[in-house]
């Protein structure tokens, strides 16, 4: 039971847990019947096992059709209780982009500071930004489809789900194949950087990936930029309109 939250009849809500099964494998399973928004409030959210299985389908597509570095998919599936699981190869030696600046990443003889390091943070952000623009986006934009979503399931970008958590989106077709493949949540905490070189190692968290209008190819390398994705309600409203 969750204090202060009354479950609505028939709603499907989700949360995810990550744990290591071995030193080289990461295992994720959706285990809790609720989700939270960016304010930390309990909310209703469509899609439970679908996001996990969509993540697996996206990893398989990206790993076979592009050179974008993603975790190696080991397996995925459904549990008897209706939840889903995802197993990937664990990546070692990395740091999330938004955590790089917590300390100086340079060798001891070349460190900028003993505490938080804005210079390292800016270097990592610049490296990630160039990599996204020069490597990731061209490859994603080259993947085309005449139908939105992925494998018949439409899970829109996270900021649209946060703006409109009640709508169940259905595939939309355009014979001109104008839909491009989008990550759906590409920001500083879905980019794993090498802790020493500060270059991109892996791009993770493909739960909301799929084929969408080109306008959905939205990304940021800063925390403020990520917050703006959710707070720009006019843009969220326009993007939601494009989904219909």
Would you name each region that the model predicts?
Residues 154-171, 175:
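Flexible internal linker/loop segments at domain or repeat junctions
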Residues 185, 189-192:
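Catalytic-loop signature of eukaryotic-like protein kinases
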Residues 176, 180-181, 194-244:
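Active-site Asp-x-Gly
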Residues 8-149:
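ATP-binding pocket architecture of kinase catalytic cores
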Residues 31, 78, 155, 208-211:
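Residues that form or immediately flank small-molecule/cofactor binding pockets and catalytic motifs
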Residues 19, 192-194:
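Well-ordered beta-strand positions
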Residues 1-9, 83, 243-244:
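Regulatory N- and C-terminal appendages and interdomain linkers associated
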Residues 55, 185, 204-205:
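Acidic active-site catalytic centers that drive phospho-/nucleotidyl reactions
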């Amino acid at each position: 039971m969750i204090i202060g939250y009354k479950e609505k009849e028939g709603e499907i809500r989700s949360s995810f847990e990550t744990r290591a099964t071995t030193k080289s494998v990461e295992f994720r399973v959706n285990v809790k019947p609720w989700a939270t928004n960016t304010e930390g409030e309990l909310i209703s959210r469509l899609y439970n096992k679908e996001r996990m299985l969509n993540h697996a389908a996206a990893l398989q597509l990206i790993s076979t059709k592009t050179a974008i570095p993603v975790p190696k998919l080991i397996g995925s599936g459904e549990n008897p209780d209706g939840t889903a699981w995802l197993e990937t190869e664990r990546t070692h030696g990395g740091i999330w982009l938004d955590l790089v600046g917590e300390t100086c990443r340079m060798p001891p003889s070349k460190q900028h500071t003993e505490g938080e390091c804005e210079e390292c943070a800016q270097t990592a952000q610049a490296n990630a930004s160039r990599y996204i623009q020069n490597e990731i986006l061209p490859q994603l934009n080259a993947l085309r489809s005449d139908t939105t979503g992925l494998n018949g399931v439409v899970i829109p970008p996270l900021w649209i789900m946060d703006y409109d958590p009640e709508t169940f989106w259905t595939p939309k077709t355009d014979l001109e194949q104008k839909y491009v493949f989008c990550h759906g949540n590409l920001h500083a905490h879905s980019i794993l950087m090498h802790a020493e070189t500060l270059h991109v190692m892996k791009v993770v968290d493909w739960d909301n990936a799929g084929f969408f209008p080109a306008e959905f190819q939205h990304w940021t390398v800063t925390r403020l930029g990520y917050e703006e994705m959710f707070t720009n309600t006019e843009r969220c409203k326009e993007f939601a309109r494009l989904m219909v």
